[in-house]
């Protein structure tokens, strides 16, 4: 454990202060468009630097409205106490050590949700909470629950709904994988499946995907640990742009923000000397 902690700390201390700043015009447009909704769902492909950074920028803009803000992250709910402790801390070396000691961060199967970029997002939210009414909610089920996809989506939505009901005056900004954030009434593979976003329909969600046209992401392609690594995104002809619609699109969201490029973010507990293939 001591060796693991030293590796974690070395990585944590090499995090950039703000490795990516989302374009302010796009962030402003998203916040303005979502202003009439209680929940802003952000769907991602896990494991990039840029999307968690964009979520931090969105949180900063939304918090400026001076309404209580709930930021939901697809982290195991068993980590909630450690997150609360970190949010109340000064963000020191020791504080990061304590946070990164959790099983979510140290697990072998690193799927991009426990990346250095996610740690940086939490640190930016911690700093923002010093001057704003903001709290972070870890809404994913712990793995011991062993739920199927539909049950997990429902459980995640219920966790977020409870947080919203506890603070009727609050709005929520939620980051999750871009299947969970779909608000459509069914799944392409199962007309009975309900995504997390659809379960939150009573809370007037606005759903937006943020993804990269080019670059790389830390992803897993199977259940095996060695399937998780940095991968280049496939070539495509998509144009980088922000589209904010009024209706649910073919991808199950209201809008999409295609960033020109994204870059893979390694696990927060990876050795700082780790290189990408």
Predicted ranges, named:
Residues 19-277:
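Compositional signal for N-terminal targeting/processing segments
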Residues 6-18:
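Bacterial N-terminal signal peptides
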């Amino acid at each position: 454990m001591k060796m693991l902690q030293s590796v974690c700390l070395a990585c944590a201390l090499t995090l950039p202060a703000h490795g990516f700043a989302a374009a302010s015009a796009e962030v402003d447009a998203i916040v303005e468009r979502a202003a009439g909704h209680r929940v802003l769902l952000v769907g991602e492909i896990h494991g990039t630097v840029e999307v968690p950074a964009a979520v931090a920028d969105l949180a900063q803009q939304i918090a400026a409205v001076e309404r209580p803000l709930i930021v939901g992250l697809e982290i195991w709910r068993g980590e909630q106490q450690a997150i609360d402790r970190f949010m109340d801390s000064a963000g020191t070396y020791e504080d990061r050590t304590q946070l990164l000691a959790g099983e979510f961060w140290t697990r072998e199967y690193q799927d991009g949700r426990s990346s250095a970029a996610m740690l940086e997002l939490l640190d930016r939210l911690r700093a923002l909470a010093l001057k704003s009414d903001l709290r972070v909610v870890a809404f994913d089920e712990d793995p011991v629950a062993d739920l199927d996809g539909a049950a997990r989506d429902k459980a995640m939505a219920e966790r977020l709904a409870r947080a919203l009901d506890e603070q009727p005056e609050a709005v929520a900004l939620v980051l999750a994988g871009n299947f969970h954030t779909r608000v459509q009434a069914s799944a392409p593979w199962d007309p009975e499946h309900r995504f997390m976003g659809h379960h939150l329909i009573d809370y007037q969600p606005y759903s937006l995907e943020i993804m990269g046209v080019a670059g790389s992401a830390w992803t897993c392609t199977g259940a095996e640990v060695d399937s998780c690594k940095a991968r280049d995104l496939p070539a495509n002809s998509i144009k980088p742009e922000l589209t904010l619609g009024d209706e649910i699109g073919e991808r199950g969201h209201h809008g999409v923000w295609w960033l020109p490029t994204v870059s893979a973010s390694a696990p927060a507990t990876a050795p700082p000397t780790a290189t990408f293939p």
